[in-house]
Structures are given as structure tokens and as C-alpha cells.
From Swiss-Prot:
Disulfide bonds: C3-C22
Protein name as annotated: Dendrotoxin B
Main location: secreted
Organism encoding this protein: Dendroaspis angusticeps
Localization: Secreted
Tissues/organs with expression: Expressed by the venom gland.
Length: 30
């Protein structure tokens, strides 16, 4: 489970899921 932010399309572990702009996606597609 990785959080994706609108400002940062790249998966970042530092990004917290606290923001509402967080999406649950699998990194397998990357």
C-alpha cells in the first residue's frame, strides 16, 4: 500500500496517508 500525491506522481514512502489526496495503488504496474 503506497500513497500517491497529486504533486508527486512517484511513489514515496515518506508521504503520509494523512492527506486526502492519497491513493491506494500497487507498485507492480510501475
Amino acid at each position: 500500500m503506497i500513497c500517491y500525491s497529486h504533486k508527486t506522481p512517484q511513489p514515496s514512502a515518506t508521504i503520509g496517508c494523512e492527506e486526502k489526496t492519497c491513493y491506494k495503488k500497487s507498485v507492480r504496474k510501475l
